[in-house]
Each structure stands twice: as C-alpha cells, then as structure tokens.
C-alpha cells in the first residue's frame, strides 16, 4: 500500500497507511511519517511515536489512531517544541504507572502523573532535562 498518496520522500518504512490514515496528503509524508499530522497518536503518546516506528498504520493504531492527537501537540517533527523539546528525538512516549489511566505520563522524561486524570499534564511528553 502506498504512503498516503505521497510521491517520494517516504520510502517503504511508511507503508501501510493508505486511506486508513484519513485524508493524508503530501504534507504528511515529510520526512518519513505518513501518519501525521492528520492521523497520528492520541494524547497518551508523544509527537514522536509515529515517526519512531516508521509512521505505519500499525503504529498509529497502537496509540488509538485518532486524527486529532498529534495536532494537539504540534502534529509534526517540529511540533515537539510545544512539548518542551527542540527536536522530536528528545520526546518519548510514556504512561502512568497508576492513578490516572492512559491519558497522562509518568517517566523521567515527563511531568509527574497527577492523582486525578483531569489534572494530568502534559498532552505529550516533556523533553528530558
């Protein structure tokens, strides 16, 4: 299956998105991930999740496959700045160990998990300082 209709710049690592990504165009194939920005990970995952596994449909599926997720934290490699990072490579997906469910983070690279889901922040992981 093609890379969300992208002509070049994706490579085989982007395979498996196709129409399942929902309206993907050439912009979502830069640089390698065809699962952003229109369909990336739900907020439980960081901006870099799709890129880290080649941007395949399976990657997005493991995070929920929501169309809005990555948009909430920038939706692109450059978007990790909004999560406290200058580059996506310093953002990491992480999840709560207890107390908040899957919508917040708890890790050395993230802000602590709150005791209630409503106060869990941020949407995507912070840069490791």
UniProtKB/Swiss-Prot annotation:
What GO CC terms are in its UniProt record? cytosol; intermediate filament
| Span list, region 6 X 4 AA repeats of C-C-X-P | 28-112
User: Where is it made, tissue-wise?
Assistant: Expressed in hair root and not in skin. Expressed also in liver and skeletal muscle.
Tell me if Repeat is a UniProt keyword of this record. Answer: yes
- The signal sequence is none
Keyword list, A-Z: Keratin, Repeat
**Start and stop residues of the sequence repeats:** 28-31, 34-37, 40-43, 90-93, 109-112, 119-122
State whether it acts alone or in a complex, and with which partners, per the record.
Answer: Interacts with hair keratins.
Q: What does this protein do?
A: In the hair cortex, hair keratin intermediate filaments are embedded in an interfilamentous matrix, consisting of hair keratin-associated protein (KRTAP), which are essential for the formation of a rigid and resistant hair shaft through their extensive disulfide bond cross-linking with abundant cysteine residues of hair keratins. The matrix proteins include the high-sulfur and high-glycine-tyrosine keratins.
Similarity comment: Belongs to the KRTAP type 5 family.
Query: What is this protein called in UniProt?
Result: Keratin-associated protein 5-6
> Gene behind this chain?
KRTAP5-6
């Amino acid at each position: 299956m093609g890379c969300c209709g992208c002509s070049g710049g994706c490579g085989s690592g982007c395979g498996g998105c196709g129409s399942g990504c929902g309206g993907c165009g050439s912009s979502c194939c830069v640089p390698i991930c065809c699962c952003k920005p229109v369909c990336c990970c739900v907020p439980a995952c960081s901006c870099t999740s799709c890129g880290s596994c080649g941007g395949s449909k399976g990657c997005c599926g493991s995070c929920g496959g929501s169309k809005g997720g990555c948009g909430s934290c920038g939706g692109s490699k450059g978007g990790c700045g909004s999560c406290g990072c200058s580059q996506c490579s310093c953002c990491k997906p992480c999840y709560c160990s207890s107390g908040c469910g899957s919508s917040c983070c708890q890790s050395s690279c993230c802000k602590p998990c709150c005791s209630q889901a409503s106060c869990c922040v941020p949407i995507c992981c912070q840069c490791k300082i």
